[in-house]
Regions:
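Structured-RNA-binding interfaces characteristic of tRNA pseudouridine synthases
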Residues: 1-254
Length: 254
């Protein structure tokens, strides 16, 4: 049985996230159906992370097992003939048997886009969060700096989610403006549910003056979700980089 890793990208507007669900269309389900049509048997896709409804991926990795002998260099073309235009497979490679798209991933980068202008741009609808009040990206960066390091991130996760530990390590959080578009790039060894979006909302709250940006450090220490900023809309969030190192497969995409 071959273990195949796919690299893909998708626009998440039409999908209810990655995870396969019975009553709604998801990216994972759509990819599984396309792969089954190509290899001639049902497949199970393991994705590199749970992206929510409306979230996009400039890069995404999934793996599946197959008995089909189709060469990896032909797989992207074959899969794309069965996929809608908003999901594209860009690469396929055979990996070792223990490779797992989520378990072998050691770092991820998400980018959140804010369209910060007094007039909305229709080309950014569901692709960036329209925010008409001017934001000072230097204040946002001061708040973002407080997230860097190893912390308990319970204050920026969705309440009611159950995980073994809420401690994560953030390697960098960079906020940049280019014209009216503000990008927030954050890299960590893992993300809690809605963590990236809540971190973005907290940086926005700091720029609004709801609390000094340096207070974010204390908000993390207190672990109070209500003290942090809101969970911003999903349409501005993109998975943008992935790092893999499980001792056998070492690579990064994005």
């Amino acid at each position: 049985m071959r273990n195949i890793a796919l690299t893909l990208k998708y626009l998440g507007i039409a999908y209810h996230g990655w995870l396969v669900q019975k009553t709604v269309t998801t990216v994972g389900q759509t990819l599984e159906e396309a792969a089954a049509a190509v290899v001639g048997h049902p497949v199970h896709m393991t994705g590199c992370g749970r992206t929510d409804a409306g979230v996009h991926a400039r890069v995404y990795v999934a793996n599946f097992r197959t008995t089909a002998r189709i060469p990896c260099d032909r797989l992207p073309y074959a899969l794309n003939t069965h996929l809608p235009e908003d999901i594209v497979v860009t690469n396929a490679m055979e990996v070792h048997d223990d490779f797992n798209a989520i378990g072998s991933c050691v770092r991820k980068e998400y980018t959140y886009l804010i369209y910060n202008s007094g007039i909305r741009d229709p080309f950014y609808v569901n692709r960036a969060w329209f925010y008409p009040k001017h934001l000072d990206e230097t204040v946002m960066q001061r708040a973002a700096d407080c997230f860097v390091g190893t912390h308990d991130f319970a204050a920026v996760r969705s309440v009611g989610t159950d995980v073994k530990s809420t401690v994560r390590t953030v390697y960098y959080y960079k906020i940049e403006r280019e014209g009216d578009l503000i990008s927030l790039r954050v890299c960590a060894n893992g993300f809690l549910y809605n963590m990236a979006r809540a971190m973005a909302g907290t940086c926005v709250y700091a720029a609004e003056g709801k609390f000094p940006p340096e207070d974010v450090a204390q908000i993390l220490l207190n672990g109070d979700r209500t003290a942090a900023g809101p969970t911003v809309p999903p349409g501005g969030l993109y998975m943008t980089k992935l790092w893999y190192d499980d001792g056998k497969a070492v690579f990064h995409v994005g």
